[in-house]
Amino acid sequence: GISSLLHSLRDAGVKLAIASNKYQDGAEKLVRHFFPELDFVMVLGQREGQPIKPDPAIVNQIMQAAHCTDRQKVVYVGDSDVDMQTGANAEVRTIGVTWGFRTREELEGCSPSAVVDTPEQLLKAILG
């Protein structure tokens, strides 16, 4: 599942972060509830005075916190057209997942690097 995927990514040295359009408090509560044992570089949600996705500001803030300047090393994973647009606007690689809000066809319409159907496929798409 997702927890196993995140642990595998962490163990492979991947820095993890969350960019959400949920309100900041809600995003943090969800992460603490479902992934209390994982350290994320940053968990960002909707905040007063900050633009929301698909504005790339949220990705730029996370990259800065992760001390990452190479956009080719960043993968933005999401389940919606807004997520795919956010990654494209931030000029990073995007991967759509089909277990969320949008269909494969809708995600593919946004021209992501890949669209995957399982956490195992996502792990392979990220790590190669």
Q: Model-flagged regions — what are they?
A:
Residues 26-29, 86, 106, 124-125:
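Phosphate- and divalent-cation-binding pockets in alpha/beta enzyme and binding domains
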Residues 11-12, 35-39, 67-69:
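Short helix-capping segments at alpha-helix termini
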Residues 1-18, 24-32, 56:
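Short, acidic loop-to-helix structural element flanking the phosphoryl-transfer center
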Residues 75-116:
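Acidic, Mg2+-coordinating phosphoryl-transfer loop and its flanking beta/alpha structural elements
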Residues 53-84:
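Conserved Lys-Pro-Asp/Glu-containing loop-to-beta segment of HAD-superfamily phosphomonoesterases
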Residues 37-52:
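A short, structured active-site edge motif that brings together acidic residues
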